[in-house]
């Protein structure tokens, strides 16, 4: 009797937990049979004859065995259903993670001081199944860190090529870290717009590891950043890095700025229009301060934008300044456009673009080959040379008044006589030297002439370069005149030596029979 009641309780509990309709029908039929059996047992009770007791006991035993077999079948069906659900869940997870292979993510890495997340690349799905902290089955992913900071995170180059002779436990480098799929996070791409002074960054060194440092200055035009590396083990602590060799780190200030921006947005929606205008003013001041800071770290050209308006009536730079442009920054709302103006170019008339490109390639790819500024400077140099030649021509020209002064008034005769006496004295002095001495003197004077011509070329370049400085032009003109006089003297000496050498050669030919 007690066994039947216990079995009835078990069947009722199974009915409460059963989800399948077929199982519920079987359990309900079994429950009805047990209730009928209990009712019959209570009615018959002690009235059953003695000879029927063994037969009734056999029926109860058979009923108990049948009940136990049905319970075992129900437990087996429930366990098989659970196993099927787990296999289906794992298959879905593997399909999901297999589709993620090749994608970038942020994966955890266990350091001595704790767990830290680093950017990584998913390269495969492990076969082993693990149980996460919440007691749910999960698969493990194999990831390679893209910004390794320690040697155990550095990917093995031989493993990537499939030639590593060591297994994962013996190799000093990483064959891929195993992390659970539920622990990965979204990939954090580098934001180079956040680069500013004292910003912490990771910098890539020749050892293929990313070392921590702080920004000293940034050149957004050439995309180069100077970083001071942390630690004392670097011989050159301050180095220049390209943007692709840097990874800006997120600071607490950035998180505070994001939170404050969200709070300011919510407050702007709740506050009045006056408060909204004040917030906009604050944002404008912050933007202007950032633009000024950007101008300090931007490449400075040799000439500021709009400097030519000093000599013209142009007002373009003034209008840009009225519209909010800050001198020293690039064009555009964020100040990251070009800093130097685009130079005007004039292409040859009647020539195709292909022909113009061929001309530029013939000039070794000179970008300023068709520049208007270069053509104007070339024309100025030609005009300057023509003016110099005209000045020399006019200075050497002898007019009527000079002829009368030199020939009629007398001092000219004495001057000519003095020059003739000087020439005769120099000729007599040259006749006293040997031919070898004359040859050595000729070589020395030729070297002096070449040196003097180089000096004159340098002075001429200085004149062209400093055309705007009047006082410097005067000093350079004096130097040029002095060099010209010395060059004329050297050339006269060279002519005298050449004449003497030619005279000696002629005499030698006359004495040969």
Curated annotation (Swiss-Prot):
Residues 312-358 form the G-patch domain. It is found in: Nucleus. Residues 252-283, 478-513 are annotated as: Disordered. Its main location: nucleus. GO terms for cellular component: nucleus. Keywords: DNA-binding, Metal-binding, Nucleus, Repressor, Transcription, Transcription regulation, Zinc, Zinc-finger. GO terms for molecular function: DNA-binding transcription repressor activity, RNA polymerase II-specific; RNA polymerase II cis-regulatory region sequence-specific DNA binding; zinc ion binding. This is Zinc finger CCCH-type with G patch domain-containing protein. A zinc finger (C3H1-type) spans 155-178. The keyword Transmembrane does not apply. Pfam families: G-patch. Residues 496-513 have a biased composition (Basic and acidic residues). Residues 478-495 have a biased composition (Polar residues). Residues 252-261, 272-283 have a biased composition (Acidic residues). One of its GO terms (biological process) is negative regulation of transcription by RNA polymerase II. Residues 262-271 have a biased composition (Low complexity). Gene3D superfamilies: 2.30.30.1190. It comes from Drosophila melanogaster. It comes from the Eukaryota. Transcription repressor.
């Amino acid at each position: 009797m007690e066994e039947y009641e216990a079995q009835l309780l078990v069947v009722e509990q199974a009915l409460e937990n059963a989800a399948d309709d077929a199982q519920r029908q079987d359990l309900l039929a079994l429950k009805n049979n047990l209730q009928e059996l209990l009712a019959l047992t209570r009615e018959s009770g002690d009235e059953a004859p003695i000879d029927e007791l063994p037969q009734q006991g056999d029926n109860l035993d058979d009923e108990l065995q049948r009940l136990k077999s049905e319970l075992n079948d129900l437990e087996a069906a429930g366990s098989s259903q659970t196993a099927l659900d787990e296999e289906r869940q794992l298959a879905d997870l593997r399909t999901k993670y297999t589709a993620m292979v090749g994608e970038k993510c942020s994966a955890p890495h266990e350091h001595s001081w704790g767990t830290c997340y680093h950017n990584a690349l998913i390269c495969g799905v492990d076969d082993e199944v693990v149980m996460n902290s919440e007691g749910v089955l999960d698969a493990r992913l194999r990831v390679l860190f893209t910004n390794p900071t320690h040697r155990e995170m550095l990917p093995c180059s031989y493993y990537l090529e499939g030639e590593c002779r060591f297994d994962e436990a013996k190799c000093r480098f990483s064959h891929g870290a195993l992390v659970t799929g539920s622990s990965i996070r979204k990939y954090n791409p580098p934001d180079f717009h956040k680069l500013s002074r004292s910003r912490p960054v990771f910098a890539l060194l020749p050892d293929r590891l990313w070392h921590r440092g702080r920004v000293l200055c940034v050149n957004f035009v050439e995309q180069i950043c100077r970083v001071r590396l942390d630690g004392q083990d670097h011989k050159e602590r301050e180095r220049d890095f390209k943007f692709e060799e840097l990874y800006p780190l997120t600071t607490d200030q950035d998180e505070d700025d994001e939170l404050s921006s969200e709070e300011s947005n919510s407050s702007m929606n709740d506050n009045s229009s006056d408060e909204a205008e004040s917030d906009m003013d604050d944002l404008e001041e912050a933007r202007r301060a950032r633009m000024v800071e950007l101008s300090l770290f931007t490449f400075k050209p040799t000439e500021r934008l709009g400097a030519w308006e000093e000599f013209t009536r142009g007002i373009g730079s003034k209008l840009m300044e009225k519209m909010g442009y800050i001198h020293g920054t690039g064009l555009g709302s964020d100040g990251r456009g070009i800093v130097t103006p685009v130079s005007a170019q004039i292409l040859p008339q009647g020539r195709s673009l292909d022909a113009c490109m061929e001309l530029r390639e013939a000039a070794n790819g000179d970008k300023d080959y068709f520049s208007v500024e270069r053509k104007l400077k070339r024309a100025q140099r030609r005009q300057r040379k023509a003016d110099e030649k005209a000045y020399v021509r006019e200075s050497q020209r002898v007019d009527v008044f000079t002829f009368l002064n030199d020939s009629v008034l007398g001092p000219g005769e004495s001057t000519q006589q003095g020059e003739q006496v000087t020439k005769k004295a120099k000729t007599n002095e040259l006749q006293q030297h040997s031919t070898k001495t004359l040859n050595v003197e000729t070589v020395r004077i030729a070297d002096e002439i070449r040196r003097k011509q180089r000096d004159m070329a340098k002075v001429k370049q200085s004149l062209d370069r400093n055309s705007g400085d009047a006082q410097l032009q005067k000093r350079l003109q004096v130097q040029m005149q002095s060099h010209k006089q010395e060059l004329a003297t050297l050339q006269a000496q060279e002519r005298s030596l050449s004449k003497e050498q030619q005279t000696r050669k002629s005499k030698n030919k006359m004495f040969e029979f």
